[in-house]
Amino acid sequence: MNGLKTPPEIGIQLPEAKVAAETGTMSGPLVPPRSDRSVRRGTDVAHVVLRFVCLLTSVIALSLMATAKEAASISIYGFLLPVSSKWSFSDSFEYLVGVSAAVAAHALLQLIISVSRLLRKSPVIPSRNHAWLIFAGDQAFAYAMLSAGSAASGVTNLNRTGIRHSPLPNFCKPLRSFCDHVAASIAFTFFSCFLLATSAILDVIWLSKY
C-alpha cells in the first residue's frame, strides 16, 4: 500500500508451546510408555509373591521348631536313662524362633502394604526412600535368618553325632521326631533367608532403574 512492502511474517513459538510440542502433552504428568508400565507391574507382582512365600516359610520354620519336643529312654553303660528334649532347652533354637517370628511379622506387614497398593493400581515401591528402607530391612533379616540357621545347625549336628571320646551317644536315635522337626525348621529357615536375599536383589534392580 502506497508502494510500501509488507514485512514478512515471523513465526514465533512460545516456550510453553515448544515444550508441549516436544513432550506431546499440554498439561498433567507424562504417561510412561506401556512397556515400562508392564515391567513395573511385573516387578510389583514379583515382590508380592516373594513376600507371601517368605511369610509362609518363616511361619512353617517357627511352627516346626516351637513344636519340637520329645521324651524317650537311652542306654549309657548299660543303664537305661530317661531323656527329654525341647526347643527351649537350647539358646540357638530360641534364637531361631525369635528371628523367624520377626521375619514373619516383617513379611506380613510388607505383604499387606504391597497388596493394598497393588489393588489400588499404585506402585508397590512409591519412592527411592521407600526402596532403600525395604532393602535395608530385607538385608538385615536375611543375615539374621542365616545366623539363626547356622547356629541351630551346629546344635543339631552335635545331637546327631554325639561327642567323640565320650559315652554320649547319638541322641537323635531315641529322639527321632524331635530331630526331624528341628532339621525341617532349619531347612525352611535357610529357604526364608534365600527369599529375603532375592527380594533385596529386586530392590537393588529397582533402585538402579528408577
Swiss-Prot record:
Belongs to the Casparian strip membrane proteins (CASP) family. It comes from Vitis vinifera. It is found in: Cell membrane. Keywords: Cell membrane, Glycoprotein, Membrane, Transmembrane, Transmembrane helix. It is a multi-pass membrane protein. This is CASP-like protein 3A1. GO terms for cellular component: plasma membrane. Pfam families: CASP_dom. The chain crosses the membrane at residues 45-65, 95-115, 131-151, 186-206. NCBIfam families: A_tha_TIGR01569. The keyword Metal-binding does not apply. The keyword Transmembrane applies. Homodimer and heterodimers. Its main location: membrane. Glycans are attached at residue 159. Residues 66-94, 152-185 are extracellular. Residues 1-44, 116-130, 207-210 are cytoplasmic.
